[in-house]
Amino acid sequence: MGGVLTLDAAFLGSVPADLGKALLERARADCGPVLHRAIESMREPLATMAGYHLGWWNADRSTAAGSSGKYFRAALVYAAAAACGGDVGDATPVSAAVELVHNFTLLHDDVMDGDATRRGRPTVWSVWGVGVAILLGDALHATAVRILTGLTDECVAVRAIRRLQMSCLDLCIGQFEDCLLEGQPEVTVDDYLRMAAGKTAALTGCCCALGALVANADDATIAALERFGHELGLAFQCVDDLIGIWGDPGVTGKPVGNDLARRKATLPVVAALNSRSEAATELAALYQAPAAMTASDVERATALVKVAGGGHVAQRCADERIQAAIAALPDAVRSPDLIALSQLICRREC
């Protein structure tokens, strides 16, 4: 991706380099069983399809050997709750709910983008059909809300559901804006970041706010953690776009240059097209050509984005957003876990 993102040492403190990965594994261990029970409670064939999408088993229910996701959003809930003095048990249902919402968006995303592969194997829509994939996404969304209705404190449950549903509305708007950006002759970096604020940052901000909420934090702390998660989500999307162009297909589970082949208006591309360089002119011609991108076109587009500085802009943006995220944290909740999850974004490969 043209270099690894680095953060100012003042923001990092003495956080162990492997803490972030340990937090993801802990989130998987704590949240996974609740997620399994939620999926198994669904009627067939929804349960089988949901477990397939989550990477737990194959279409015939035989054990799958692939990835089952990172549990990054669940880890954000746990870390935010812990930073506010909350209990893991209280945060677990919320963690499961946000993972379900995240996966509902992935199911719909795959349909809208026409992606036939996720995590190295066929997507749900390409196995069972478009209509089924949409309905499964709806079912995961409904199951997430059902989990939150079971929270012990009814007041917290209502506030949590309200926040989650507002973030879902923001997600829909962000996804709609993403659709509008495709094929637009002129898209600015600000246009892109406004879209990413809804498509990605809304949910990561919600995750952190919900963690603080179940820990009974005050409104100011909840707002600060939501801002932290929002900025982190923008950084996550920036890095996601870098991976979409320069990521290793063996790690990402998607074809090389997948975003470029589909002429997606990702941040590196948008930045490159706005560079007013010769490379930008040639890249614009490739993006506006009526014929589908060939493998050589994708290779050339990749080189042009790099020459025009698109990768550098996206890296810098991710770095700035992570620093803004950490700066948003009050000292009382600036925990090693939250810092470690911030660092993890810099080092992610898929």
Swiss-Prot record:
<dbReference type="InterPro" id="IPR033749">
    <property type="entry name" value="Polyprenyl_synt_CS"/>
</dbReference>
<feature type="short sequence motif" description="DDXXD motif">
    <location>
        <begin position="240"/>
        <end position="244"/>
    </location>
</feature>
<keyword id="KW-0808">Transferase</keyword>
<dbReference type="GO" id="GO:0004659">
    <property type="term" value="F:prenyltransferase activity"/>
</dbReference>
<dbReference type="InterPro" id="IPR008949">
    <property type="entry name" value="Isoprenoid_synthase_dom_sf"/>
</dbReference>
<feature type="binding site">
    <location>
        <position position="73"/>
    </location>
    <ligand>
        <name>isopentenyl diphosphate</name>
    </ligand>
</feature>
<feature type="short sequence motif" description="DDXXD motif">
    <location>
        <begin position="109"/>
        <end position="113"/>
    </location>
</feature>
<feature type="binding site">
    <location>
        <position position="119"/>
    </location>
    <ligand>
        <name>isopentenyl diphosphate</name>
    </ligand>
</feature>
<dbReference type="GO" id="GO:0004311">
    <property type="term" value="F:geranylgeranyl diphosphate synthase activity"/>
</dbReference>
<comment type="similarity">
    <text>Belongs to the FPP/GGPP synthase family.</text>
</comment>
<feature type="binding site">
    <location>
        <position position="70"/>
    </location>
    <ligand>
        <name>isopentenyl diphosphate</name>
    </ligand>
</feature>
<feature type="binding site">
    <location>
        <position position="109"/>
    </location>
    <ligand>
        <name>Mg(2+) 1</name>
    </ligand>
</feature>
<keyword id="KW-0460">Magnesium</keyword>
<comment type="pathway">
    <text>Isoprenoid biosynthesis; geranylgeranyl diphosphate biosynthesis; geranylgeranyl diphosphate from farnesyl diphosphate and isopentenyl diphosphate: step 1/1.</text>
</comment>
<dbReference type="GO" id="GO:0046872">
    <property type="term" value="F:metal ion binding"/>
</dbReference>
<protein>
    <recommendedName>
        <fullName>Geranylgeranyl diphosphate synthase</fullName>
        <ecNumber>2.5.1.29</ecNumber>
    </recommendedName>
</protein>
<feature type="binding site">
    <location>
        <position position="113"/>
    </location>
    <ligand>
        <name>Mg(2+) 2</name>
    </ligand>
</feature>
<keyword id="KW-0479">Metal-binding</keyword>
<comment type="function">
    <text>Catalyzes the condensation of isopentenyl pyrophosphate (IPP) with (2E,6E)-farnesyl diphosphate (E,E-FPP) to yield geranylgeranyl diphosphate (GGPP).</text>
</comment>
<dbReference type="InterPro" id="IPR000092">
    <property type="entry name" value="Polyprenyl_synt"/>
</dbReference>
<keyword id="KW-0444">Lipid biosynthesis</keyword>
<feature type="binding site">
    <location>
        <position position="113"/>
    </location>
    <ligand>
        <name>Mg(2+) 1</name>
    </ligand>
</feature>
<feature type="binding site">
    <location>
        <position position="109"/>
    </location>
    <ligand>
        <name>Mg(2+) 2</name>
    </ligand>
</feature>
<dbReference type="GO" id="GO:0033386">
    <property type="term" value="P:geranylgeranyl diphosphate biosynthetic process"/>
</dbReference>
<dbReference type="GO" id="GO:0008299">
    <property type="term" value="P:isoprenoid biosynthetic process"/>
</dbReference>
<dbReference type="GO" id="GO:0005829">
    <property type="term" value="C:cytosol"/>
</dbReference>
<feature type="binding site">
    <location>
        <position position="102"/>
    </location>
    <ligand>
        <name>isopentenyl diphosphate</name>
    </ligand>
</feature>
<keyword id="KW-0443">Lipid metabolism</keyword>
<dbReference type="Pfam" id="PF00348">
    <property type="entry name" value="polyprenyl_synt"/>
</dbReference>
